């Protein structure tokens, strides 16, 4: 060991001396004595390694308290951090899909703070059913006879098939054998549920007679799957639920439908493309309809099944139901969200998903123009900051071919180097509330459709 190396090692402080320094008192109060000591030991090991490899001290050795504070602050951040979603995808799966209404947030907080009547009947002091209140709401909204709640729509489809068709065949059009992401495919779900898939028709055309010819003594269900995350266009043919229900009645085979996204309102009244609604399928005579809680419905992640009472009873009594049931927080948020649908006149104001989807391009354009000047002044030395028209997408496999006119702020590096865009995007991801955009066509795009806290956004980007 050289004299210089020995000198560097001697400059490393003792942990006891650091802990008695006044700058460490607040750190010990905030993070605890044990964690601070653990980190100091780790940092001393790091410093010794740097000395050994490069014959120098790490820069942070000049201020140990500051480095400890920075590391522990970062460590204490939640893994689920709030972000500003300016990707242009409203229901972004990686960013948690639907934002919850304030009523849902308050309901969850209340359910977390105190015991609740999850499975307790106040009328007779007996045991209640956790789905009962929600089932009543869902029946009122959809016209169904009963309802069942599980933790997501994939679980809903699994339970629906396992409880009503295990060991038997389920007839599905080949054009509806969807994959919803993460290699989750309808044929795979059927195998897990113990069903046998009976494909009919072709990818682009399926006729009523295809279903008729497929039905045999081992057929349990005729199934429709809404292709919510893709669209087959051109020379196509598919039969709707009403026609399939009529055929099912003739052949004494129930019809079930997986709607996927599942909107409880006619979106066309808000200027959006229309999606099939559970209440329409219930009115058509479909026995069971499954859909998601956290997509177009705008609530928490949940799988909802509505339909005929005797069919729902089979789902409720199946062993999988307990494994897949929703917890009290999910049920609280979903109930509060569904209650908003009882006042449809205020829905676009109180339901964040609908509020964001229905923002007009003109309003977003005005917002973009308002923000452009201060951002151009701040970033203009390196980037051209412009207002550009763009198209938002709904996301989460909803309305896959439909786009919503919007406006974006774009940042284009003067030197054209893509590395500058990556650096800017990385810098914004390190903000107290990370700002998430997307890099495309030599620009960093910030689609403003989902920007509601404009002041906080500006304060962070102008620092």
Curated annotation (Swiss-Prot):
EC number: 2.9.1.1
Localization per Swiss-Prot or TrEMBL: Cytoplasm
Pathway connected to this protein: Aminoacyl-tRNA biosynthesis; selenocysteinyl-tRNA(Sec) biosynthesis; selenocysteinyl-tRNA(Sec) from L-seryl-tRNA(Sec) (bacterial route): step 1/1
Alphabetic keyword roster: Cytoplasm, Protein biosynthesis, Pyridoxal phosphate, Selenium, Transferase
Modification N6-(pyridoxal phosphate)lysine occurs at: 295
First-listed, main subcellular location of the protein, grouped into a coarse class: cytoplasm
A biological process from GO: conversion of seryl-tRNAsec to selenocys-tRNAsec
SUPFAM superfamilies xrefs: PLP-dependent transferases
GO cellular component: cytoplasm
Molecular function GO terms recorded: L-seryl-tRNA(Sec) selenium transferase activity
Superkingdom of origin organism: Bacteria
Keyword Protein biosynthesis listed: yes
Swiss-Prot/TrEMBL cofactor(s): pyridoxal 5'-phosphate
InterPro entries per the UniProt record, alphabetical: PyrdxlP-dep_Trfase, PyrdxlP-dep_Trfase_major, SelA-like, SelA_trans, SelA_trans_N_dom
Reactions catalysed according to its record: L-seryl-tRNA(Sec) + selenophosphate + H(+) = L-selenocysteinyl-tRNA(Sec) + phosphate
Assembly information from the UniProt record: Homodecamer; pentamer of dimers. Binds only one seryl-tRNA(Sec) per dimer.
Family indicated by similarity: Belongs to the SelA family.
Function: Converts seryl-tRNA(Sec) to selenocysteinyl-tRNA(Sec) required for selenoprotein biosynthesis.
Protein's UniProt name: L-seryl-tRNA(Sec) selenium transferase
Gene designation per UniProt: selA
């Amino acid at each position: 060991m050289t004299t210089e190396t020995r000198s560097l090692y001697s400059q490393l402080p003792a942990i006891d001396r650091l802990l008695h320094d006044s700058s460490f008192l607040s750190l010990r109060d905030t993070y605890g004595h044990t964690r601070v000591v653990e980190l100091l030991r780790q940092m001393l090991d790091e410093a010794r390694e740097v000395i050994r490899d490069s014959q120098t001290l790490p820069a942070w050795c000049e201020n140990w308290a500051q480095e400890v504070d920075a590391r522990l602050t970062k460590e204490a951040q939640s893994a689920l951090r709030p972000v500003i979603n300016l990707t242009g995808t409203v229901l972004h799966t990686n960013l948690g899909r639907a934002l919850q209404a304030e009523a849902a947030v308050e309901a969850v907080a209340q359910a977390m703070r105190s015991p609740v009547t999850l499975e307790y009947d106040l009328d007779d002091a007996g045991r209640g059913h956790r789905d009962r209140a929600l089932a009543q709401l869902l029946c009122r909204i959809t016209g169904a006879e009963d309802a069942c709640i599980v933790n997501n729509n994939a679980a809903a489809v699994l339970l629906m098939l396992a409880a009503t068709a295990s060991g038997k065949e389920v007839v599905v059009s080949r054009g509806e054998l969807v994959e919803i992401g993460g290699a989750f495919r309808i044929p795979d779900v059927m195998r897990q549920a113990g069903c046998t898939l009976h494909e009919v028709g072709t990818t682009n055309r399926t006729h009523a007679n295809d279903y008729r010819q497929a039905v045999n003594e081992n057929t349990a269900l005729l199934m429709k799957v809404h292709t919510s995350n893709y669209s087959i266009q051109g020379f196509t043919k598919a039969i709707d639920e009403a026609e399939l229900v009529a055929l099912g009645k003739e052949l004494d085979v129930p019809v079930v439908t997986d709607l996927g996204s599942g909107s409880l309102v006619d979106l066309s009244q808000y200027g959006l493309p229309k999606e099939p609604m559970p209440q329409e399928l219930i009115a058509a005579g479909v026995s069971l309809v499954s859909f998601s809680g956290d997509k177009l419905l705008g609530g928490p992640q949940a799988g909802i099944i509505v339909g005929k009472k005797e069919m729902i009873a089979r789902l409720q009594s199946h062993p999988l139901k307990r494994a897949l049931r929703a917890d009290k927080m999910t049920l609280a948020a979903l109930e509060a969200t569904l209650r908003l649908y009882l006042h449809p006149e205020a829905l676009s104001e109180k339901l964040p998903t609908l509020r964001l989807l229905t923002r007009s391009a003109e309003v977003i354009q005005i917002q973009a123009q308002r923000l452009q000047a201060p951002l151009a002044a701040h970033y203009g030395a390196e980037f051209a900051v412009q207002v550009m028209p763009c198209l938002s997408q709904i996301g989460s496999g909803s309305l896959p071919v439909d786009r919503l006119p919007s406006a974006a702020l774009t940042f284009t590096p003067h030197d054209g180097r893509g590395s500058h865009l990556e650096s800017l995007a990385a810098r914004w991801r390190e903000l107290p509330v990370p700002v998430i955009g997307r890099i495309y066509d030599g620009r960093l795009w910030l689609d403003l459709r989902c920007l509601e806290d404009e002041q906080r956004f500006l304060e962070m980007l102008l620092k």
